[in-house]
């Protein structure tokens, strides 16, 4: 086996080496020595794990993103030591995996001795003002989440990092390093390629590992996928794909592989926006047609107002304050029957990751508008209450999937500290968020008939969007031309 050094970069807002990071580093240790570099200090338990698992551990100031981490690691190792390795791997925590035997990938690439450096996947050329610099063009390149450099390129590789400047933003990191690394070394005469062959997808997707991760894992031998698949902004995802990539990826990992995907999701939940994860993973279920033998325990308003402990193996029913107006009317109509509540409670057995369930948002458009408005109004109070409970969470502009309608169902195990006092509207927003902090998802449910109606509402909404699309495009061109003329007149 080749002598290989793996420089593994990790970052976690709470200083953790989470479950997915540990799995990756431990698996990579089977194919090389792991140099673990962390942006920011590690928590004591994570530091102890890293020191026991990895060959070297470097904790550095959280500056420069991945560029800063790789640069400090390379410079600390030094050129003389780097030259003792056949290959040096740069990889980071944004990849999850490996799924299957990662050694097979290295064995396959050993069959290409003509390459001087190679990567896992590539990003195809695209126009981008955000990442493309002055020319607004991103070239085709190896994605920086996994790059392998061979020994004959090592001197120039070391010189590259000696000269590398620390980026001040994520955009700078992509623009000045990731999109330029491949071209820089290709211009020096070094040959490169990627392990995963996606040439047939180049005309469809500029970023195949995000657009079709399940395809790459199942059919192209790719041993890794992006964590971001599960929390990318869903509106952005719908601009590129049909919005099903993450759910398909999860189902494949869960049913066809041994990869501990639920451990990854539990690690992501406390640090990523709940709404984005719920949308990408479609945490929305049709009520099972069963007798509904699991009757939830009612927690009345007086009990909720005081706060209470919960039994971990029990399911509880929480009534919510009634809304006013037309929205209140439709919220009341969405209240499940006793049978439907019992059927919904059975969903907890089928979905162990779910800690909170509630009715889907009513189809009346005003309910979504009012929920978004109330979330923006209540968000500062919710953030303050989370801080008081010592539960730092990222709150998105998009409201959490729950609460909706007039009730919530909760799994006792999702609240090991119990429920805090719940009286006001901002209090009840805490329920899905506290479950999220404890590594549990929130999901909505509805009947099959409601789901069929929702599809018709979606069709009507899309038709309306198509109708106004040309108007917005015309407005955009008008504004663009006006700005161009103003710029020209100012010269």
Predicted regions and their residues:
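ER/Golgi luminal nucleotide-sugar-dependent glycosyltransferases, focusing on the catalytic module
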Residues: 1-491
């Amino acid at each position: 086996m080749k002598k290989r050094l793996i420089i593994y970069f990790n970052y976690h807002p709470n200083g953790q080496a989470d479950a997915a990071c540990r799995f990756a580093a431990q698996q990579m240790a089977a194919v090389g020595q792991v140099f673990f570099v962390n942006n920011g200090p590690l928590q004591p338990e994570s530091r102890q794990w890293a020191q026991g698992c990895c060959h070297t551990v470097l904790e550095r100031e959280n500056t420069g993103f991945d560029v800063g981490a790789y640069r400090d690691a390379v410079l600390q190792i030094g050129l003389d030591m780097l030259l003792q390795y056949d290959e040096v791997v740069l990889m980071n925590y944004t990849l999850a995996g490996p799924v299957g035997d990662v050694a097979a990938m290295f064995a396959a690439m050993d069959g290409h001795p003509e390459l001087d450096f190679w990567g896992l996947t590539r990003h195809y050329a695209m126009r981008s003002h955000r990442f493309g610099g002055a020319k607004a063009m991103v070239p085709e390149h190896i994605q920086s989440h996994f790059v392998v450099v061979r020994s004959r390129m090592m001197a120039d590789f070391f010189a590259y990092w000696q000269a590398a400047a620390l980026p001040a933003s994520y955009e700078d990191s992509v623009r000045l390093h990731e999109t330029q690394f491949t071209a820089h070394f290709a211009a020096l005469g070094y040959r490169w390629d990627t392990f995963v062959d996606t040439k047939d997808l180049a005309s469809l997707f500029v970023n195949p590992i995000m657009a079709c991760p399940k395809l790459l894992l199942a059919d192209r031998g790719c041993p890794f996928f992006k964590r971001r698949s599960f929390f990318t902004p869903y509106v952005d995802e719908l601009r590129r794909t049909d919005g099903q990539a993450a759910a398909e990826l999860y189902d494949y990992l869960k049913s066809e592989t041994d990869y501990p995907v639920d451990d990854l999701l539990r690690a992501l939940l406390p640090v990523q926006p709940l709404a984005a994860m719920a949308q990408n993973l479609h945490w929305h279920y049709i009520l099972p047609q069963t007798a509904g033998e699991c009757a939830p325990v009612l927690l009345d308003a007086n009990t909720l107002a005081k706060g209470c402990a919960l039994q971990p193996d029990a399911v509880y029913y929480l009534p919510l304050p009634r809304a006013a107006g037309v929205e209140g009317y439709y919220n009341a109509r969405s209240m499940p029957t006793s049978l439907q509540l019992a059927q919904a409670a059975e969903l907890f057995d089928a979905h162990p990751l779910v800690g909170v369930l509630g009715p889907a948002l009513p189809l009346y458009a005003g309910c979504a508008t009012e929920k978004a408005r109330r979330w923006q109004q209540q968000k500062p109070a919710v953030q303050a209450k989370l801080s008081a409970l010592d539960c730092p969470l990222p709150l998105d502009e998009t409201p959490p999937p729950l609460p909706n309608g007039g009730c919530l169902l909760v799994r006792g195990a999702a609240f090991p500290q119990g429920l805090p006092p719940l009286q006001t509207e901002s209090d009840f927003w805490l329920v899905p968020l506290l479950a999220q902090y404890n590594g549990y998802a929130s999901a909505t449910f509805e009947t099959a008939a409601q789901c069929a109606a929702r599809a018709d509402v979606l069709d009507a909404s899309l038709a309306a969007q198509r109708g106004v699309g040309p108007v917005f495009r015309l407005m955009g061109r008008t504004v663009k031309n006006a700005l161009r003329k103003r710029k020209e007149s100012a010269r």
